[in-house]
Design a protein with these regions (language model features):
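N-terminal small-domain helix-loop-helix segment of the aminotransferase-like
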Residues: 8-97, 104
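Aromatic/hydrophobic pocket-lining residues that form π-stacking "cages" and hydrophobic walls in ligand
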Residues: 21, 126, 187
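Helix C-cap/helix->beta junction micro-motif
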Residues: 28, 133, 193-194
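Short acidic capping loops at alpha-helix termini that bridge into adjacent secondary structure
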Residues: 86-92, 112-115, 162
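Conserved PLP-anchoring active-site segment centered on the Schiff-base-forming lysine
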Residues: 108-130
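A short helix-loop-beta submotif of the ANL/AMP-binding
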Residues: 132-138
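Active-site phosphate-binding strand-loop segment of PLP-dependent enzymes
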Residues: 138, 143-197
Length: 197
């Protein structure tokens, strides 16, 4: 099979510098890896024990693809008790991870040519996910001197008639920065004003 049988978007992939960085990192001694948020800590013994008990009790098979009824109810209860928000079971879905959930969300909301705003530094898959969903990534900066907080005026300047959503990454990967309550409120106000996801 030759490469031209692949979808055109995969025939000439962009260079992925992460592979080169990974190879270089492996050649270094005593390097602290901050790339994927995978700590070198052993999982808490209580979690290990509970997982083992669940496996021994027969919880080793596939569950419902959108999440078990017990899980969905736990999510509903959490959002009610913590944030006083009400959700119906049909509004809650489980995914295999945050990247999977993000990609499914982008597929659900993005039409070809829609612009999706992401703030940099950003988790490297975000740009690709937006493009694979048919969207156009619009990258805006955040700055170390501001604690990597998203500035409302910079966000406003990036919005166009094609803007569909703003990706919020807090705590941020890779910086670890957490948006302040004030920053979140400004983003929410702008999103409501412009009818953005």
């Amino acid at each position: 099979m030759n490469r031209y049988n692949l979808a055109k978007k995969y025939q000439e992939p962009e260079e992925n510098i992460m592979m080169d960085i990974g190879a270089l990192a492996k050649s270094q001694e005593e390097l602290i890896d901050l790339s994927i948020g995978d700590p070198d800590l052993i999982t808490d013994e209580r979690i290990i024990e509970q997982a083992a008990q669940d496996a021994k009790a027969g919880h080793t098979r596939y569950t419902a693809s959108d999440g078990s009824a017990a899980f969905i109810q736990t999510v509903i209860d959490h959002y009610k008790s913590r944030y006083d928000l009400d959700f119906a079971a049909k509004q809650v879905r489980a995914t295999v991870g945050a990247m999977h959930g993000m990609y499914l969300t982008l597929l659900a909301i993005t039409d070809p040519g829609d612009e999706i705003i992401i703030h940099e530094p950003y988790f490297s898959p975000y740009k690709d996910q937006i493009e694979l969903a048919g969207g156009i990534p619009v990258v805006i900066p955040t700055y170390e001197k501001d604690g990597f907080q998203l500035e409302a005026d910079i966000l406003e300047q990036a919005i166009s008639k094609k803007t569909k959503a703003v990706v919020i990454n807090s705590p941020n990967n890779p910086t670890g920065a957490v948006f302040s309550e004030e920053t979140f409120q400004k983003i929410a106000d702008i999103a409501i004003q412009h009818d953005l996801f």
